[in-house]
């Protein structure tokens, strides 16, 4: 089994790190460069920067934050938010990022995935999928052309959302994951909108369904509240990596504690 990764996520708005619940109610969590350095020292395997205002408010990319971070941080850095073109990819990678994450742009122009992976290599292309449960009655299952799964409280399919979780697309997340793999993406960053910020654990059913439908590495995101949740994402969700924000930003747990919890239970982790 490959080493599982712990990835702090820094949601950035107006050049500051913020953390919200279900994509709303942001509260300031600090300076991105300082936090990135702190997590690098703490033993994070990678970092994700998401400029959460960029796609929705058409804000330009946070190039200077990326440049300042890349000078001080030597673990892989993924940057997303507001990336719409090959030129945006080029600028982000030139600023020092290792990978670029796209969500809204990928849904609106799937060919961008193919183009970017051909030009920069699929290892640089991360497709972020923000998904939400769409519940259906049992008697409707055969009538809708979606991957309906049984969940704790009924039946649902998982719908892809864009513009920072604000707009539904009608697209089935399982089908979309298969499509982005076909188009040449190197990794999927999968966020459960239902779980985001709740600290009640990842959506293990969503994570498992996506993980088993593709060969790509899947990063579980949304809902991490304690080390046990990370362990569950790896064991039951079949995730390759776990993304988290609030529990780290507010020092509820350290990366070392999370890694040790998983390693003690047989999960291969890179320990300091």
From Swiss-Prot:
InterPro entries: Aldolase_TIM, His_biosynth, HisF, IGPS_HisA/HisF, RibuloseP-bd_barrel. It catalyses: 5-[(5-phospho-1-deoxy-D-ribulos-1-ylimino)methylamino]-1-(5-phospho-beta-D-ribosyl)imidazole-4-carboxamide + L-glutamine = D-erythro-1-(imidazol-4-yl)glycerol 3-phosphate + 5-amino-1-(5-phospho-beta-D-ribosyl)imidazole-4-carboxamide + L-glutamate + H(+). CDD domains: HisF (cd04731). It is found in: Cytoplasm. The active site is at residues 11, 130. One of its GO terms (biological process) is L-histidine biosynthetic process. GO terms for cellular component: cytoplasm. Keywords: Amino-acid biosynthesis, Cytoplasm, Histidine biosynthesis, Lyase. GO terms for molecular function: imidazoleglycerol-phosphate synthase activity; lyase activity. The keyword Signal does not apply. Pathway: Amino-acid biosynthesis; L-histidine biosynthesis; L-histidine from 5-phospho-alpha-D-ribose 1-diphosphate: step 5/9. Disulfide bonds: none annotated. Its EC number is 4.3.2.10. The keyword Cytoplasm applies. PANTHER family: IMIDAZOLE GLYCEROL PHOSPHATE SYNTHASE HISHF, IMIDAZOLE GLYCEROL PHOSPHATE SYNTHASE SUBUNIT HISF/H IGP SYNTHASE SUBUNIT HISF/H. Belongs to the HisA/HisF family. NCBIfam families: hisF. IGPS catalyzes the conversion of PRFAR and glutamine to IGP, AICAR and glutamate. The HisF subunit catalyzes the cyclization activity that produces IGP and AICAR from PRFAR using the ammonia provided by the HisH subunit. Heterodimer of HisH and HisF. This is Imidazole glycerol phosphate synthase subunit HisF. It comes from Methanocaldococcus jannaschii (strain ATCC 43067 / DSM 2661 / JAL-1 / JCM 10045 / NBRC 100440) (Methanococcus jannaschii). The gene is hisF.
